[in-house]
């Protein structure tokens, strides 16, 4: 699927008015707020919190969440939790049309940035897929060679950006984040992730190899390869309505899949942090917000009030000040 041509064909034919509220003049770059961080660090929460202070719209930059389907497995923010804030490129791409590449994302997200700015709103890029973030933001993007984050790539991260960016990096200590991510997987299972994956499973698919590098699109999502191995042994249709942990063998296979999901999610978070540090080292002006204490409170306190209080003081309030200064520049 040529997503770039689709975006070009759908592009508006009229020139949008200057966004006075964002202090953007014709000769200046469009302003863009970028919320970065490893998976599970609260980027979506922060975007919704900031919407109470600024007129904004969200552009998703999570490469699994762009696809339709597997809403629980890919941890998409639910419609009620969006609080009426418009979201773009979230569950919009049909996975049957092929994999969305960084070049495709650059085209589609770039169009969204212009449209949001034209509505006198602040575009906010939210997601942990740093290859998509890099593709959208750099002034010159080469899609002909290996990506800047691909193994064996000698590409250099560019510090020349095509937008006037404000970067907020939501960070959580690895130990606390690891514990939280394990709990999040358990919560996702309670919400119905197992049933969602059972419905998604197709024995006719040829890419059941657990190595995500051999998979494409939505089939790369953490949870799919891990449970494919389970469903190969215990077909969903053969055990419909039964408890997946009914007997010892099945329970062992189920627990192994869950363990692998937790482990791979933590590995993903560590890789994402490494990429963020690489962007920072290349000169990207990332403002780090330490959310560790709010996450620790969420894991240890029975009341959400303490967690919310810490989050607002250590993450939200500093973010509001930073964004306010950014918009006044």
UniProtKB/Swiss-Prot annotation:
Which residues are recorded as binding ATP? 37-44, 63, 74, 129-131, 220-222, 313
The record's listing under SUPFAM superfamilies reads:
P-loop containing nucleoside triphosphate hydrolases
Expressing tissues: Expressed in roots, stems, leaves and cones.
Sorted UniProt keywords: ATP-binding, Cytokinin biosynthesis, Nucleotide-binding, Transferase
Q: Which domain of life is it from?
A: Eukaryota
Query: Might you report a single GO cellular component term?
Result: mitochondrion
Q: Top EC class per UniProt?
A: transferase
Catalysed reaction(s)?
dimethylallyl diphosphate + AMP = N(6)-(dimethylallyl)adenosine 5'-phosphate + diphosphate; dimethylallyl diphosphate + ADP = N(6)-(dimethylallyl)adenosine 5'-diphosphate + diphosphate; dimethylallyl diphosphate + ATP = N(6)-(dimethylallyl)adenosine 5'-triphosphate + diphosphate
Please name the Gene3D superfamilies in this protein's record: Crystal structure of tRNA isopentenylpyrophosphate transferase (bh2366) domain, P-loop containing nucleotide triphosphate hydrolases
**Record-level GO BP terms:** isopentenyl adenine biosynthetic process; tRNA modification
Per the record, the similarity remark reads:
Belongs to the IPP transferase family.
Record function comment: Involved in cytokinin biosynthesis. Catalyzes the transfer of an isopentenyl group from dimethylallyl diphosphate (DMAPP) to ATP, ADP and AMP. GMP, IMP, CMP or UMP are not used as substrates.
UniProt protein name = Adenylate isopentenyltransferase
List the source organism: Humulus lupulus (European hop)
Provide the organism lineage as a comma list: Eukaryota, Viridiplantae, Streptophyta, Embryophyta, Tracheophyta
């Amino acid at each position: 699927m040529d997503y770039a041509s689709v975006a070009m064909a759908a592009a508006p034919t009229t020139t949008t008015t200057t966004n006075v509220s964002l202090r953007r003049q014709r000769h200046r770059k469009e302003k863009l707020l970028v919320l970065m961080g490893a998976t599970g660090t609260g980027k979506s929460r922060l975007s919704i919190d900031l919407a109470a202070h600024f007129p904004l719209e969200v552009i998703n930059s999570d490469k699994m969440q762009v696809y339709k389907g597997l809403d629980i497995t890919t941890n998409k923010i639910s419609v009620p939790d969006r609080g009426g804030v418009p979201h773009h490129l979230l569950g919009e791409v049909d996975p049957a049309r092929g994999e969305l590449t960084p070049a495709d994302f650059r085209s589609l997200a770039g169009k969204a940035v212009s449209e949001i700015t034209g509505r006198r709103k602040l575009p906010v890029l939210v997601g942990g897929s740093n290859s998509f973030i890099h593709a959208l933001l750099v002034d010159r993007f080469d899609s002909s060679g290996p990506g800047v984050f691909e193994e064996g790539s000698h590409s250099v991260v560019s510090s020349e950006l095509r937008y006037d960016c404000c970067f907020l990096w939501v960070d959580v200590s690895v130990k606390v984040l690891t514990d939280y991510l394990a709990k999040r997987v358990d919560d996702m299972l309670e919400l119905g992730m197992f049933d969602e994956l059972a419905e998604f499973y197709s024995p006719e698919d040829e890419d059941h190899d657990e190595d995500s590098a051999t998979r494409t699109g939505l089939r790369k999502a953490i949870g799919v390869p891990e449970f494919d191995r389970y469903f190969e042994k215990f077909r969903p249709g053969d055990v419909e309505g039964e408890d997946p942990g009914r007997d010892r063998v099945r329970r062992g296979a189920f627990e192994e899949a869950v363990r692998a999901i937790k482990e791979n999610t933590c590995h993903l978070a560590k890789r994402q942090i490494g990429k963020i540090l690489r962007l920072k080292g290349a000169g990207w002006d990332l403002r780090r917000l330490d959310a560790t204490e709010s996450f620790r409170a969420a894991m240890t306190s029975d009341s959400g009030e303490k967690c919310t209080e810490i989050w607002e003081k250590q993450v939200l309030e500093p973010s509001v000040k930073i964004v306010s200064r950014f918009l006044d520049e």
